[in-house]
Regions:
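Contiguous, well-folded functional domains in the mature portion of proteins
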Residues: 1-150
Length: 150
């Protein structure tokens, strides 16, 4: 078995997925993981892989990694409705990324001013089982958010 260490994609405080005020994430319909109440301004790649999906509005991205591991990083809740307000894509879809590669700029104040939650789920939607989850404060590209065993 291999262990994939998924780093925090943005500075902030870990929130258990079950406490996310969105049923799709709270009930793990999109996959297991955790969420972050972000304090940072840039979302980075949490693992090495290919940026297989980068939404034009910048509110979410997906990475395909080794061992069929797939991650979804969703910045805020219902933020697709903002049509890019509060987000700026830095990376490009199809690009290879390493942990810490900047992907999206995030304006927390603007997203909140537009009436959206900034709670940001990070979920594993591919192979493997999450074995350890962080709690407390995490730093983007530095601290392990969770571990996936594949």
């Amino acid at each position: 078995m291999a262990e994939i260490h998924v780093l925090a994609p943005i500075d902030g405080t870990v929130v258990p997925l079950e406490e996310v005020p969105d049923e799709v994430f709270a009930q793990k319909m999109a996959g297991d993981g955790v969420a972050i109440d972000p304090s940072g301004k840039v979302a980075v790649a949490p693992i090495s892989g290919e940026l297989v999906k980068l939404f034009p509005g910048g509110h979410a991205f997906g990475i395909a990694a080794a061992h069929d591991v797939e991650l979804i990083v969703h910045l805020g809740l219902d933020t697709i409705e903002l049509q890019g307000q509060g987000f700026k894509n830095i990376a490009s879809e199809g690009q290879h990324v390493e942990p810490g590669t900047p992907v999206v700029e995030f304006d927390r104040a603007k997203v909140e001013a537009l009436g959206r939650s900034v709670i940001s789920p990070v979920v594993s939607s591919g192979a493997g089982t999450i074995t350890r989850k962080a709690s407390g404060a995490v730093r983007a590209g530095q601290d392990v958010l969770f571990v996936i065993e594949v």
